[in-house]
Amino acid sequence: MKIVKISPRGYCYGVVDAMVIARNAALDTSLPRPIYILGMIVHNKHVTDAFEEDGIITLDGPSRLDILDKIDSGTVIFTAHGVSPEVKQRAKEKGLTTIDATCPDVTKTHDLIEAKKAEGYHVIYIGKKNHPEPEGAVGIAPDIVHLIERADDLKTLEIPTDKILVTNQTTMSQWDVQHLMEDIQKKFPTAEFHKEICLATQVRQEAVAKQADVADLTIVVGDPKSNNSNRLAQVSQEIAGTKAYRVADVSEINLEWLQGVENVAVTAGASTPTPITKEVIAFLEQYDPMNPATWERVRKVPLQKILPRVKVKKEQ
């Protein structure tokens, strides 16, 4: 079996930065305890489990405000997906120490929404409902930001001005966003468009589109909650024309997928730890359908190998 290692794949700078911020927080003895992450720091359970070992507690819930209600003291880390001004204000009112790990690409979108609100615009925001990134973006200006996920949402959308900005969640499929923007243009011809697919997401999607077409199967390594991982599987199927499955790690690979397969493409979401992806590749490289000794699929990567290394500051 030939393995096509799609490149680039895996961690983006925003994810690594967020994890380094959280690791440094865990090592900072001056920060009030306990230390919480408001939702998953990045959408990968292996990462959140590793942070639990570091003493950082991940809390999840239907919204960031709901999660904040569970916290009475300590330090709160805002995730890479960003939060609304209301969340920041609520944390301040509760007397919590806050650390912001928002991805710079997300912050750029928030700043754009604020600037356009000041100019009297309404904003159509393309994103996934119940995902934390759109929650934070809509929360920047909930009175003028309209979240849509698919073309059907446009049917009932009415906006009381011709001053309209269209932007999007950074981890969406660039092809889905383009198609939706074309539909929006037809209904709102005066709209201005700012496509905000982050560069890391874009190049990973384009790599799958161009490199997975030679494979019989694509395996995307990523968490089920990771939107960018799910979009990579979608791109493989819809753009490259190659059947795709998403797995959290090697243990989720179904041997039936590999029957009759000669070429397997492997990629990974931007929040997927590199050792987890390497373990998947190593399994596929040694797999022999005629040798049961090669069929074992057990994640063996220790949690301490998941998180990026940080330098411990020496006391003066």
From Swiss-Prot:
| UniProt-annotated binding residues for isopentenyl diphosphate | H43, H81, H131, S226, N228, S271
Q: Which family does it belong to?
A: Belongs to the IspH family.
Cofactor comment text = Binds 1 [4Fe-4S] cluster per subunit.
One biological process term in Gene Ontology? isopentenyl diphosphate biosynthetic process, methylerythritol 4-phosphate pathway
Is Iron a UniProt keyword of this protein?
Answer: yes
What is the name attached to this protein's record?
Answer: 4-hydroxy-3-methylbut-2-enyl diphosphate reductase
What Gene Ontology molecular function terms does this protein carry? 4 iron, 4 sulfur cluster binding; 4-hydroxy-3-methylbut-2-enyl diphosphate reductase activity; metal ion binding
